[in-house]
Amino acid sequence: MIEQQKRKGPELPLVPVKRQRHELLLGAAGSGPGAGQQQAAPGALLQAGPPRCSSLQAPIMLLSGHEGEVYCCKFHPNGSTLASAGFDRLILLWNVYGDCDNYATLKGHSGAVMELHYNTDGSMLFSASTDKTVAVWDSETGERVKRLKGHTSFVNSCYPARRGPQLVCTGSDDGTVKLWDIRKKAAIQTFQNTYQVLAVTFNDTSDQIISGGIDNDIKVWDLRQNKLTYTMRGHADSVTGLSLSSEGSYLLSNAMDNTVRVWDVRPFAPKERCVRIFQGNVHNFEKNLLRCSWSPDGSKIAAGSADRFVYVWDTTSRRILYKLPGHAGSINEVAFHPDEPIILSASSDKRLYMGEIQ
């Protein structure tokens, strides 16, 4: 297990955009982890800021321990733990509450881990890697229970089915989208694209796979008919992140054209499926696969950004609710806690932050 340097973040409120509060600066570039941070005794009362709205030990918690860029992060469905992974090939498991201890390290990938997902009940954790494989882990024991081999290049994305038999879809630089049943050795279906696939997800009923890649298009593949059903066009650059809303009607996409879009993926939706466009976050020369996510109730969305800020928008008004500073590198993924108003961010600065949002 790697030795982690766990520190609490500064005990200041996260600052919503356009609200008059004192400026929040968390470990700006060059200041190093923990620079100027105040340590509080466990259970200490906070003297300033708005009332607390979560069960975190402090309004902002810093999780450090990764030895390279952190590409992905996810809360366990029960909300008590989280997983993170990235360039150092390790998957770190953390407690959400208390001191946010890094209580386990999952080793097995020989390349960077590009994406992580828990299945619906949280019993399994899926990881996609540049070692051309997807690993399936028992989230209780930390044991790797399956290794899915078949891609011939980097696996950029994976997503487990929400219900039914444990299926998982994957997307790779080899241009294919694959469907796997983890009870079987090889992929059970393969869809060929002309270009690299950067992001995949299932629709709500898991009879379609949705993929995005460097051809700028979002494709919907029908598993029963084994063919491309329709294509959603609108992005002007590579699609790097996809996320299905909790009720399954809308798809969120993040792309290198510096827009985040919401698409209506219901079966009989109008032909023009793009229903919202959000702006503010940016991609840059690093070309990281910046992901995106929905809040559990669908009222907010969040996206990774190369300008070192976490962006959170109101889904209806499209207004930026929060532009959160703190990281010293590209923010690659942002995740919402399943039960509490907590947001988690993973960054190329090797760190994660957890913070309360009102």
UniProtKB/Swiss-Prot annotation:
Main location: nucleus
Described purpose of this protein according to its UniProt entry: Required for pre-mRNA splicing as component of the activated spliceosome. Component of the U5 small nuclear ribonucleoprotein (snRNP) complex and the U4/U6-U5 tri-snRNP complex, building blocks of the spliceosome. As a component of the minor spliceosome, involved in the splicing of U12-type introns in pre-mRNAs.
Subcellular location: Nucleus
Keyword check for Ubl conjugation: yes
Mapped WD repeat ranges: 65-104, 108-147, 150-190, 192-231, 234-273, 284-323, 326-358
Name of the protein this chain belongs to: U5 small nuclear ribonucleoprotein 40 kDa protein
Cross-link Glycyl lysine isopeptide (Lys-Gly) (interchain with G-Cter in SUMO2), where in sequence: K18, K271
